[in-house]
């Protein structure tokens, strides 16, 4: 048995055929290139059609489609709210796939990237054998996939895991509103923006970030500057570590997980901070629970969402650990 898995990211679509053993074949990527609304939906359908053609040529029976998307998903209807894709306010993705690929007649399962990432780690990554695990995805934004007692948590409106809005610092300032307090300081976007602010404000600063036009400073540049001992990069990342540690403490105290897995584009370079994150969490968390949790980097930095989408489809849209 095999399924088609598709992972919609912020800049590209990845698709593949995934079998029951976790084998991945015919991985294909398409760049979004500024597409919006139905243009993105059409590109998804084209990617799926390409995989169906591959499956037919190689005589691989396809039983379902699993799709991983950013934002929030109504898992019952397949409607998607993806704020980074204009026109995807309540986008009927599952129905569009079924309508535009009527000849294939297989079920379509859609879930958010937070949940799909934790599915991938449970199946083939750092969470194998766990029943209580949290996947922290830190990239442009911050989100969490949460599995407790073998069940994925989705919430009343499928919005669980929008952790960028965790309230970690007082008093409230208006700048937190669009992305939340946690993302403001500790997402890739937040790290980049806080570094730009500090460079702009400190006229006496002559570190490595000053060598770049402020508008061109990226999160990657901040980590590179940190490695060179840059004071602004060190300050910005120290604040991010503090926030990551406080968030970890909150998750540990609320959910008592076995593992918290750190992934997304930032963890990458930020995986070196995992011991410091644990030390910060140790100050704040429930004292017994924090000593029982393990903080680890993802084992699937490039494929957790895609494998998770495959796992979702292979399990008929219901991931529940026995």
Locate each region found by the language model.
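Glycine-rich beta-strand-to-loop/alpha-helix junction loops that act as flexible
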Residues: 65-71, 261-269, 298
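Glycine-rich phosphate-binding/hydrolytic loop that grips phosphoryl groups
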Residues: 18, 109-122, 268-322
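Proline-aspartate-enriched helix->loop->beta-strand connector
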Residues: 248, 252-261
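Short glycine-aspartate micro-motif
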Residues: 3-7, 62-66, 109, 133-137, ...
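Glycine/GP-enriched mid-protein hinge/lid loop-to-helix segment characteristic of carbohydrate kinases
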Residues: 16-18, 25-27, 34-37, 100-102, ...
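N-terminal, positively charged, Ser/Thr/Ala/Gly-biased leader segments
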Residues: 1-4, 11, 18-25
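Glycine-rich phosphate-binding loop and adjoining helix at the ATP-binding site
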Residues: 32, 38-45, 57-65, 71-134, ...
């Amino acid at each position: 048995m095999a399924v088609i898995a598709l992972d919609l990211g912020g800049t590209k679509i990845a698709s593949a055929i995934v079998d029951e053993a976790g084998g991945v074949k015919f991985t294909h990527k398409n760049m979004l290139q500024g597409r919006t609304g139905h243009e993105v939906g059409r590109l998804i359908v084209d990617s799926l059609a390409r995989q169906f053609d591959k499956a037919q040529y190689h005589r691989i029976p396809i039983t379902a489609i699993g799709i991983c998307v950013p934002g929030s998903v109504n898992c019952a209807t397949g409607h998607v709210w993806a704020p980074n894709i204009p026109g995807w306010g309540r986008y009927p993705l599952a129905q569009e796939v079924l309508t535009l690929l009527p000849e294939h007649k297989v079920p379509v399962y859609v879930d958010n990237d937070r949940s799909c990432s934790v599915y991938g780690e449970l199946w083939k990554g750092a969470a194998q054998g766990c029943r209580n695990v949290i996947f922290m995805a830190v990239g442009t934004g911050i989100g969490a996939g949460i599995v407790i007692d073998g069940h994925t948590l989705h919430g009343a409106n499928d919005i669980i895991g929008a952790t960028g809005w965790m309230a970690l610092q007082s008093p409230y300032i208006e700048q937190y509103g669009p992305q939340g307090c946690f993302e403001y300081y500790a997402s890739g976007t937040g790290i980049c923006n806080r570094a730009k602010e500090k460079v702009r404000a400190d006229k006496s600063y002559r570190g490595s970030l000053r060598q770049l036009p402020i508008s061109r400073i990226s999160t990657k540049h901040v980590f590179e500057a940190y490695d060179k001992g840059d004071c602004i990069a060190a300050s910005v990342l120290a604040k991010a570590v503090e926030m990551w540690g406080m968030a970890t403490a909150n998750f540990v105290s609320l959910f008592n997980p076995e593992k918290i897995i750190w992934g997304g584009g930032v963890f990458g370079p930020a995986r070196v901070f995992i011991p410091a994150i644990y030390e910060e969490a140790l100050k704040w968390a429930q004292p017994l629970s924090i000593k029982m949790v393990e903080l680890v980097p993802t084992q699937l930095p490039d494929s957790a969402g895609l494998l998770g989408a495959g796992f979702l489809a292979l399990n008929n849209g219901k991931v529940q650990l026995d």
